[in-house]
Amino acid sequence: MYYFSYNYIDINYQYSYNHAQILKIRGIMELLKHNIDYIIIGILGVMSFFVLWYTIERIIFYSRVNINSYKNIEELDGALTKNLTTLYIIYSNAPYIGLLGTVTGIMITFYDMGMAGGIDTKSIMIGLSLALKATAFGLLVAIPTLMIYNGFVRKVDVMINRYKAKNASK
């Protein structure tokens, strides 16, 4: 055997772990197995709440804003684009949060296969299909947020152009 740091590799290149390392890995995987759905869906739920909150806030603001009350275009632009960056960040990252859940679900499926010692096609397919739901939830958050964001960007462009047209002669 050839010794490397704290782990050793036998002649068949199989990693060997001590009992404490195996228990630690099992504990982490069991923790993920029981909680990853709650964590991922919880994060996506919080993101959805912010999308809903900022969407309602922007709709109310855009319906009440008086563009003539602003002294310059920079002040108007700052007011009109408030919270749009948050919507952009959410629609950009929600699919990645979902993908993280899917990758973790696939890891758990492989872990379960390894612990069972055999290959059962039915359990693999069930595990993989359940893992994909996280990506679906991520897309479910991202796609409407993208549409809302683009609608607001268009609204901001129209209001800024209206401001420029009214103040061009001054």
Where do the PLM segments sit?
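Cytoplasmic juxtamembrane regions at transmembrane-helix boundaries
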Residues: 157-170
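Short, Lys/Arg-enriched N-terminal segments with co-localized hydrophobic residues
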Residues: 3-28
